């Protein structure tokens, strides 16, 4: 595997794509949907000149761009292949997603326990969406849709006849009242969640000591990403952690446009091990290194 491919940017990209949905935008491209936007450096001729020749058929049936902000081409994974943060991308029409039985989807992707599956909305979201409400219940989404429908009736239109049963002023008041009720409910939920967080602070602090240093760094980084509208590939590094929360032997930085990625070896506390070039162009093998 090329040192640029285990790009840790794939953690943020895959997680955001799976759980939040926004696409990744290159520099100059417009953001679609909500969520952070990753602005990558352009893949110009200088960056492409540093790429190795792409694999050829029959070993490779489809070429895709390497994960993160890399510019080189690599083989795409096929449907059913194992995937995750440190793997190549899935092929066209596929998406790397955790298995339905996974209790911690993001952690599964970080540990490479995902699989390439059809990217249709039904297959991706069925395991994460709540069960459909009974006919007598109305969800907030339905209320928003109904409110929007009522509000659209208020707007004059030459192509629509206003129903005499719905007076424009009365309909507009219903929209306002529903909006105020939703805001009040949201405030109540937020207040109750804050109270619960305060009560559980001591227990969370106690559990935090059980996590390894890599796990704590990774969670701090991901929590920080939630509040960013624009992500800079230069300033974010998501560590490679083992199941116990300690650092894996091999850590990598992703490619950044014309700048190639690199890897280095560390002990389980994240300290670089001597004798390994941290910015070498060749792949770094840490399998024989004992992380003590």
From Swiss-Prot:
Region (Disordered): 127-161, 191-211
Biased composition (Polar residues): 129-139, 192-203
Main subcellular location: secreted
Post-translational modification: Phosphorylated by FAM20C in the extracellular medium. Phosphorylated by CK2; resulting in decreased nuclear localization.
Residue ranges of coiled coil: none
GO molecular function: fibronectin binding; insulin-like growth factor binding; insulin-like growth factor I binding; insulin-like growth factor II binding; protein tyrosine phosphatase activator activity
CC annotations in GO: extracellular space; heterochromatin; insulin-like growth factor binary complex; insulin-like growth factor ternary complex; nucleus; platelet alpha granule
Record's subcellular location: Secreted; Nucleus
Domain of life: Eukaryota
Disulphide-bonded residues: 40-69, 43-71, 51-72, 60-75, 83-96, 90-116, 214-241, 252-263, 265-286
Residue list for modification Phosphoserine: 149, 202
Stretches assigned to the IGFBP N-terminal domain: 36-119
One GO process term, biological-process aspect: positive regulation of MAPK cascade
Domain Thyroglobulin type-1 span(s) in chain numbering: 211-286
UniProt keyword list: Apoptosis, Disulfide bond, Glycoprotein, Growth factor binding, Nucleus, Phosphoprotein, Secreted, Signal
Pfam families recorded: IGFBP, Thyroglobulin_1
TM regions (residue ranges): none
Gene3D superfamilies named in the record: 4.10.40.20, Thyroglobulin type-1
Name of this chain's protein: Insulin-like growth factor-binding protein 3
């Amino acid at each position: 595997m090329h040192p640029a491919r285990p790009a840790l940017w794939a953690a943020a990209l895959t997680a955001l794509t799976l759980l939040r949905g926004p696409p990744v935008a290159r520099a100059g491209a417009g953001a679609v949907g909500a969520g952070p936007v990753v602005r990558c450096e352009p893949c110009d001729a200088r960056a492409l000149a540093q790429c190795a020749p792409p694999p050829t058929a029959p070993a490779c049936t489809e070429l895709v761009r390497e994960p993160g902000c890399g510019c080189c081409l690599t083989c795409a994974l096929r449907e059913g292949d194992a995937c995750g943060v440190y793997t190549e991308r899935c092929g066209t029409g596929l998406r790397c997603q955790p298995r339905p039985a996974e209790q911690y989807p993001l952690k599964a992707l970080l540990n490479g326990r995902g699989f390439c599956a059809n990217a249709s909305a039904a297959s991706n979201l069925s395991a994460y969406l709540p069960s459909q409400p009974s006919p007598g219940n109305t969800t907030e989404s339905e209320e928003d849709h109904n409110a929007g429908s009522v509000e659209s009736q208020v707007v004059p239109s030459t192509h629509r006849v206003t129903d005499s049963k719905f007076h424009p002023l009365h309909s507009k008041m219903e929209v306002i009242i529903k909006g105020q009720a939703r805001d009040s409910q949201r405030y109540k939920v937020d207040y109750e969640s804050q109270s619960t967080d305060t009560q559980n602070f001591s227990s969370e602090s106690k559990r935090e000591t059980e996590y390894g240093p890599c796990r704590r760094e990774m969670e701090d980084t991901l929590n920080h990403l939630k509040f960013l509208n624009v992500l800079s590939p230069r300033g974010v590094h998501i560590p490679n952690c083992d199941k116990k929360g300690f650092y894996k032997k091999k850590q990598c930085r992703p490619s950044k446009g014309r700048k190639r990625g690199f890897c280095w070896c560390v002990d389980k506390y994240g300290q670089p091990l001597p004798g390994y070039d941290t910015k070498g162009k060749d792949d770094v093998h840490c399998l024989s290194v004992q992380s003590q």
